[in-house]
């Protein structure tokens, strides 16, 4: 791996960018907790308050682990966000359960989630990089 300052800066910036959505969603959830709970009620999850709190924790803690990569454990944050992102497909974007045009809209969201997972996998691979 290249051992340059530019590479390190790019790596740090990429960690922020790959987690940006999760930071924004987690911070929004902290300040709009009732709305997050209602989303969990809408999709029929049991214990919506617990799931809402878990969602926010996962988004913020996973992002922090990736960005700060303490002792090389950023891969745990990547894993947290990968599992979270994949679970949102059947729980929140079950495109197969809808008719058109909503089916296509939800399918596109699911594809975007798969793309995010690819970025998170790369962040897990780079978690072991040391300057």
Where are these regions (language model features)?
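Extended, low-polarity transmembrane helix blocks
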Residues: 1-32, 49-61, 68-131
């Amino acid at each position: 791996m290249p051992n340059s300052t530019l590479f390190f800066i790019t790596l740090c910036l990429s960690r922020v960018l790959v987690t940006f959505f999760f930071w924004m969603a987690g911070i929004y959830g902290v300040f709009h907790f009732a709305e997050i709970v209602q989303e969990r009620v809408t999709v029929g999850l049991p214990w919506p308050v617990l799931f809402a709190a878990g969602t926010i924790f996962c988004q913020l803690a996973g992002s922090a682990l990736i960005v700060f990569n303490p002792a090389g454990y950023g891969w745990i944050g990547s894993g947290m966000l990968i599992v979270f992102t994949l679970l949102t497909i059947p729980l929140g974007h079950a495109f197969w359960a809808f008719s058109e045009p909503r089916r296509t809209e939800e399918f596109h969201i699911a594809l975007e989630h798969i793309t995010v997972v690819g970025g998170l996998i790369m962040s897990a691979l780079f978690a072991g990089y040391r300057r």
